[in-house]
Amino acid sequence: MHLSPNDSNQYRYLTLSNGLRVLLIHSDTAQQSAAALAVNVGHFDDPVDRQGLAHYLEHMLFLGTEKYPKVGEFQSYISQHGGTNNAWTGTEHTCFFFDVTPSAFENALDRFSQFFTAPLFNEEALDKERQAVDSEYKLKLNDDSRRLYQVNKEVINPEHPFSKFSVGNLDTLGDRDGQSIRDEIVEFHHSQYSADLMTLTLFGPQSLDEQQAWVEAMFADIPNHQLSGKSINVPIGTEDSTGILVQIEPIKEFRKLILTFPMPGMDKHYGVKPLSYFAHLLGYEGEGSLMLQLKSKGWITSLSAGGGASGSNYRDFTVSCTLTPEGVDHVDDIIQAVFQYLTMIKQDGMNEWRYLEKQAVLESAFRFQEPSRPLDLVSHLVINMQHYQPHDIIYGDYKMSGYDEDLQRSLLQYLSVDNVRVTLIAKGLEYNRTAEWYFTPYSVTPFSSEQKRFFQQIDPRWQFVLPEKNPYICYDLDPMPFENGGSLPELIEDLEGFRLWHLQDDEFRVPKGVVYVAIDSSHAVASPKNIVKTRLCVEMFLDSLAKETYQAEIAGMGYNMYAHQGGVTLTLSGFSQKLPQLLEMILRRFAAREFNPTRFETIKQQLLRNWRNSSQDRPISQLFNALTGLLQPNNPPFATLAEALEEIEVDELSTFVESILAELHVEMFVYGDWQRQQAHDMATTLKDALRVKEQRYEEALRPLIMLGQNGSFQREVHCNQQDSAVVIYHQCEDIEPRSIALYSLANHLMSATFFHEIRTKQQLGYMVGTGNMPLNRHPGIVLYVQSPNAAPAELVTSIDEFLNAFYMVLLELNDYQWHSSKRGLWNQIATPDTTLRGRAQRLWVAIGNKDTEFNQREKVLAELKKLTRADMIRFVVNELKPRTANRLVMHSQGQAHIDAPRIHLGQEIGSIEEFQLRPKDCGLG
């Protein structure tokens, strides 16, 4: 097996007697164990009259087995032992995965293995979970991506299984005359879930021999029906599915143009990755690129290439553009430009050195590969096992074995006018069809011969240029020598308006680094209008950088700038050798900043559209946005931002930036394999660009509205959607480690029980959960439900009943369950950083939180260790019981429940401005 020299794991690949392929992974340092099983069965395998059956089966396997019959037992066991679990159903595969504390791994595996040998398919659970599947379907009825996907299913070959309805609902999964859904799901599981279609991956600190013994004992009984090598013999396309324009009406306000080129399946070419070559050239964003020239015309705002649906016998290659309103009127011109660029590639762009550049980038990424989270690792590799040869399971994603011009040119033939399907997504077009299941309006029109001739013309207005050699690619990479230093960040510059933190990494020893720069300014967040100006400036700056930074991103470096409650933060990450060069270039662009009126108008309209579109988001998302906007004055809700943006003009921005520069406070963190002097050098570059001298400006305050001892507050948000939703937030008044431990443990203990009670048992909705929700360093806990079945008043009643009874759940836990739950949370909090970037982020958060001793985590763990069951019961009764709790209830009454009784509890929040006059905690960071 081809492994990275940076990979310290031990691997063993084997095939069980029943044909199940297994990958075992041992790590000496693993703090968590994980497993994933994938089966080569998906919605393509659904019976035509039972569409959604594979998805329904995926749900049912979690709900009881012969050995462990209790519904929800698996999830409770995993949750109590510090783990998580999930699954997904795709076109041709279904994947199940979980992680858990290592001491519970054997028992968790035993429960997991029963899914595939002896599921119960309990009648009551079948009926309730069918409701959950139906709720999941209804949840996505207004989801544009799902609505567009359905149209794609209708314009390809109707005989191909891609055309099937994948989710299922009450209609497709109900009992019928003479047809019991239970009989059919049992038969589907028995006939389709064959061991020779399965792959299994385990990860943990257990030895490979121990893991192998478990696997052989638990998974060898899965039956083998000799199904390996199954294939799809129906082509995905017909003559009518290319050479057409498909117009689709979205729900949200956006415009997109997608050119789709159907191709044969590409699995056999994974070791060459021929399509990535074309994706890079078409997606290039530098001078002379397709994107830049279309952008300069004011027709598009972004362009990407290479993505698209893929399966065992098909692969779509797409070129996708986000259009401006003017771009909708120039669709044929944009298509013509794409084909002219493709002609240039055919004539001048077939060069081995371009392939070798991409190969070098992937080889560096593989060589200095950093560990993934155990759950991410097993769920990724178990799918790789379905596609790659055993020796390439780890390496296959990075493998580029050599330039094959004959193969490249053969694939270029598919990128033709006769083999394209163009999809235009925009409002206000002509539609004469309605898609099944999601009711999407659309139309299909064949291109005329005149249009096809136009698409193939060479137009002199396009001055396209292919990318030059990439100056950012690093061919000779090794970590820099390690200077003697501590293991924690050190403050190496401490000026009035500037602080520089530095740490040279001594653990991961990879030639990578991360730079954070927080630019705080009270002026940047002084009003909603200033907050919007700050975001506008950030978006315009990022827009101006794209053409110069694209090559750096291709070479394994990344950057971002984002606005927050105190100002803006700039981050850079990637290979350290040339990251200072990227920082210097970004700062040079900042010094020469200009606010182009045309780009300003485009970006302004883009932001307006995004913020207005939020009114079409799921009700639960709108409630969370309204909640944070209510409690964090420096983080207004989207509607407030959109209103403020309407008034802003381009000529206001230059003086606005100058006023920020006149009173800013900068904090910088340089972490990676850079030595101290290099950190000073980067800081000097930064201070020169931002004109940082000896200013005496402080960091901006981040106010948080405190609920105080006032019982329940409630506010209704009008979402104009079918579903109702409720979010209940409990706020902690202090930021002490003990409080963090209490809120974290409460959430950890109640999450699985709440899910089981509200979703599995009561079937109130598909989106159900609890979560930690710290705001401005204050711990908080949130409970939420979005429901097609119940109005907010009923949802709040159900949540309150759960909270009122939860202390009984705690009393009924035996000592083993109590200590296992604490240990599970302990392991989650104490999990060591697995990547350099992950550690950088944790240390940066500590710097922002003024945890300058970097020991907040240890303090929380110490408090967690001390917590008793009596402490937790006291906390639940005193802080979470609805009658006495200080909380904020956000709710939205769906159209389906418009006549249901309204919520009447606590103090209703009418005016946001008045509510925000309440006492605030104005902290830093």
Language-model segments: residues:
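Short, Gly/Pro- and small/polar-rich lid/capping loops
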Residues: M1-T15, N233, G485-I492
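Glycine-centered hinge/linker elements that transmit conformational signals in sensory
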Residues: Q212-S228, M682-R696
